[in-house]
């Protein structure tokens, strides 16, 4: 398979996911659209009041970049009738795939659909699909940068991203995860290609600006900071040079995204308004539970690979068993990559590992306070994870390597096709 064919497969599957999932029925899509509606109508950021949450609810506290782009793309006229979508469906089984009942969260299927909002949702989903395609390209380019003489490894890394059913599902919905994922992938590629030599402070400044832009997409981009500081420290001849470059990078990031943090501090008393967001979402745990992610690892792994709809459309257990095995093999492959002579000592590779580990720790911290262990929260480091896994597979004996590089993408493609062509359409079939 060549890169062009992989991109075509990604686009075909993503469009099929977009067609299969009814408007606003993807995870949190209604709330993300609500933020776009507010910006398109009012042309100013919302000031969130817990007593009047609005269509966006807790998502109105997200950084605004994705929604600003979306509002500019669709305009206010298409969204005049958006409220007609936000009619709760009686008997909905949100978050409970094990219960009988309808999978629809909003607007009973026999109600007339507002055409303007339908067109806006389609356009915003196409934006997300385009961002996903860019992420796939960036994953390929990152692997090519680290292993320039091995095109098969680069293609395998790109396939691990492109054919992940959950990546395709979220990537075909209205969701700011898609923007922070592609911006994180761009930061990863830039970090792998930059020298961060003491005489090139510009590299640190550019990296800081990129992270600042990513932070305006989603606060989870903070996980990009430790790998950047590590790359700077590894390239610097002494502590003074490292401090100078790190200061330049952090200063650049603060200039780009600092206003958003200050605004939150002024309005909500926290840099990212986390408490208010949890109150509005209704997912604040009664107490701090530092080991929550370990206890909920089953759902965490499942939702990295594929849990659809309002967390109420799932695969059969056998498919998840295969995903558990694939996850274990992926972790083993990452460890092999880090143990490979020469490769494991490369600061660029270590930075990728630091990003993946930092993202996992950030999710664990988030889960210790909030309900809902979602594997898709690892998507900001999905490029790093895929590249490391691909580099580990490259160390296998030739035959095992070839089999893995064919079998894994084939399984992911089959699972994705089953989800978007059978599983999701059946879940939303109207008798």
Q: Where are the regions a protein language model picked out?
A:
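Perimembrane helix-loop-helix junctions
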Residues: 193, 224-254, 261
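Transmembrane-helix signature of polytopic, membrane-embedded enzymes
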Residues: 4, 97-115, 139-163
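Membrane-interface alpha helices of multi-pass inner-membrane proteins
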Residues: 157, 203-219, 224-227
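Short helix- or helix-capping micro-motifs
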Residues: 10, 157-162, 189, 211, ...
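Membrane-interface transmembrane helices that cradle and orient dolichyl/undecaprenyl
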Residues: 144-149, 187-206, 214, 233
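Membrane-lumen/periplasm interface segments of multi-pass, membrane-embedded glycan/lipid transferases
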Residues: 265-339
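Signature aromatic-anchored transmembrane alpha helix within multi-pass, membrane-resident enzymes
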Residues: 7-8, 250-254, 396-428
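Interfacial juxtamembrane loops and adjacent helix segments
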Residues: 38-127, 282-288, 294, 298, ...
């Amino acid at each position: 398979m060549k890169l062009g064919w992989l991109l075509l497969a990604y686009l075909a599957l993503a469009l099929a996911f977009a067609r299969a999932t009814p408007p606003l029925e993807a995870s949190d899509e209604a709330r993300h659209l609500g933020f776009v509606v507010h910006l398109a109508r009012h042309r100013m950021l919302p000031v969130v009041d817990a007593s009047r949450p609005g269509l966006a609810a807790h998502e109105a506290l997200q950084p605004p970049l994705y929604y600003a782009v979306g509002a500019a793309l669709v305009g206010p006229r298409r969204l005049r009738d958006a409220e007609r979508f936000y009619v709760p469906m009686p008997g909905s089984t949100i978050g409970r795939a094990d219960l009988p009942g309808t999978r629809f969260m909003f607007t009973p299927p026999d109600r007339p659909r507002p055409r303007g909002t339908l067109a806006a949702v389609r356009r915003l989903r196409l934006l997300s699909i385009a961002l996903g395609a860019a992420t796939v390209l960036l994953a390929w380019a990152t692997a090519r940068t680290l292993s320039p003489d091995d095109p098969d490894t680069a293609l395998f890394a790109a396939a691990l991203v492109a054919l992940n059913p959950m990546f395709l599902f979220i990537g075909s919905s209205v969701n700011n995860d898609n923007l922070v994922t592609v911006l994180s992938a761009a930061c990863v590629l830039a970090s792998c290609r930059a020298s961060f030599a003491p005489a090139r402070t510009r590299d640190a400044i550019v990296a800081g600006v990129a992270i600042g832009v990513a932070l305006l997409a989603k606060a989870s981009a903070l996980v990009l900071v430790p790998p950047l500081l590590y790359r700077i420290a590894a390239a610097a001849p002494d502590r003074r040079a490292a401090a100078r470059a790190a200061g330049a990078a952090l200063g650049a990031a603060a200039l780009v995204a600092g206003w958003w943090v200050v605004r939150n501090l002024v309005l909500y008393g926290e840099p990212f308004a986390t408490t208010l967001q949890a109150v509005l979402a209704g997912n604040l745990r009664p107490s701090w539970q530092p080991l929550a992610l370990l206890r909920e690892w089953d759902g965490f792994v499942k939702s990295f690979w594929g849990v659809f709809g309002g967390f109420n459309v799932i695969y059969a257990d056998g498919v998840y068993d295969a995903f558990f095995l694939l996850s274990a093999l992926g972790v083993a492959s990452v460890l092999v990559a880090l143990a490979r002579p020469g490769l494991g000592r490369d600061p660029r590779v270590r930075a990728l590992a630091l990003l993946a580990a930092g993202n996992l720790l950030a999710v664990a911290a988030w889960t210790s306070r909030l309900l809902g262990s979602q594997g898709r929260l690892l998507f900001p480091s999905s490029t790093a994870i895929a590249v490391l896994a691909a580099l580990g597979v490259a160390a296998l004996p030739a035959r095992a390597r070839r089999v893995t590089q064919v079998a894994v993408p084939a399984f992911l493609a089959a699972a994705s096709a089953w989800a978007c062509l059978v599983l999701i359409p059946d879940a939303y079939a109207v008798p």
